[in-house]
Amino acid sequence: MGVFSSPMSTLRWVTLFAALLSLLEWGTAHEDIVMDGDQVVQQQGRSCDPQRLSACRDYLQRRREQPSERCCEELQRMSPHCRCRAIERALDQSQSYDSSTDSDSQDGAPLNQRRRRRGEGRGREEEEAVERAEELPNRCNLRESPRRCDIRRHSRYSIIGGSD
């Protein structure tokens, strides 16, 4: 006779089919969540891009008293959980720019000697830049946290200029 000859075996097959169907449906829903999660991560990665803070890098480089309106708008559009990381990267880029302009100096001395001559002044400039970067969300009057970033820095200049 057939597989579905008794009502009990028909019920078992229907139950098994329903269980497999629900398991398959759950797996598809789970996959969608993971894919959505990947998309969120990708979007978050893009929103953490320090290139989106070009006006803020200008603020960090030029040491203005207040960031420009454009800088604050760029920061406002950025995802709150990415702001400090992007600000730190923008600070790194602005300091890389500053040190590359050092190498173009015409005084003929090697770069690390020029840095050592400026020594304390350069360290203070770097500390002030870090403070400006840490306070940037607050200076832009952003409502969401974080309103202050914790940026830990090690001076590149003390490492570079260690020996003669």
From Swiss-Prot:
The keyword Transit peptide does not apply. Belongs to the 2S seed storage albumins family. Residues 92-107 have a biased composition (Low complexity). It comes from Pinus pinea (Italian stone pine). This is 2S albumin seed storage protein PINP1. GO terms for molecular function: nutrient reservoir activity. Residues 1-29 form the signal peptide. Glycans are attached at N138. SUPFAM superfamilies: Bifunctional inhibitor/lipid-transfer protein/seed storage 2S albumin (SSF47699). Residues 92-137 are annotated as: Disordered. The gene is PINP1. Residues 120-137 have a biased composition (Basic and acidic residues). Pfam families: Tryp_alpha_amyl. Keywords: Allergen, Glycoprotein, Seed storage protein, Signal, Storage protein.
